[in-house]
Amino acid sequence: MSNILIIKHGSLGDIAQASGAIQDISENHKNSKIYLMTTKPYFELFKKNPYINEVILDKRLPKYNLIYLYFLMRKLKKYNFSKVFDLQNSSRTSFYKNILFPKANKNIWSSTKTTLPEDTNKEKFDKGSVLDRFNHQLKDSGLNTINTLKPNFSWACTEIGEIKRKYDLQKYILLFPFCSPHLSVKKWPYFDELIKLIKDKFETDYKVIIAPGPKEIIEAKKFDAKIILDNNKALNVSQLTSLIKESSFVVANDTGPAHIAAHVAAKGLTLFGKHTTAHKVSIERENFKSIQVTDLNNLSANKVFERLLNLL
């Protein structure tokens, strides 16, 4: 039995997107043992993935930390991997390749660089959609891809009956009005107005809820919506995924939870400004759609609510 390594460090949205590619790698190597190397936030989560046999932790310490680098590379070499699928495709993972398999081609180390089409360069190739890039990488590496273009993140779910009973959650609309502090361009400023429109229209038919991350709990209190926590702490990724999957509708900025919603077949809507496009991040699905504008400040709550009504 040979050993296969998949590398996927993060972020949350990236993890959800890669689910189909990971499944295809596993199903194309049924007689191999599948290892996945990731970072601490996703180490325990990936242990739940049925297509992975073992998870390896990469602390991603600085490259100049030679002691850490030495022990990590020594550990990886002991597995004697017959093939590596680099789904992170970062400068860091290219650095790892240069240490582990400096002369390897796509038959040993599959990445966007080793599978790059002859008629383009990496800069142009990276402008394509995420899932299309994964699909090309795996197909060019000789894999039959059935799931790459339609990732299913439902493997991350867990039972949340106790949380739903505590907050009396039956039919609910789940909002994610947050974004990373350094990416404020992604933030739509009218969630408070949207909440009022939803409540005026549906009254008690749907609860309006927010599930903040650990650093978003204080900000969440600014909104007229029920805040969903577990013992006064933010939900973990598995709980959050289940809450999203079982929702009636999701409205989110372009953040990790939006990508989860897209890839668990939840109904919903995500809002895009000029920072990128819904096509490039492969977020639109059968049940999950986007609104793309040049300036999120000019996207009215009424416009979002109208789209919500059409999709709900």
Task: Label the predicted regions.
Residues 33-65, 225-229:
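Conserved nucleotide-sugar phosphate-binding/catalytic loop shared by glycosyltransferases and other
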Residues 152-218:
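Active-site donor-nucleotide binding/catalytic segment of nucleotide-sugar enzymes
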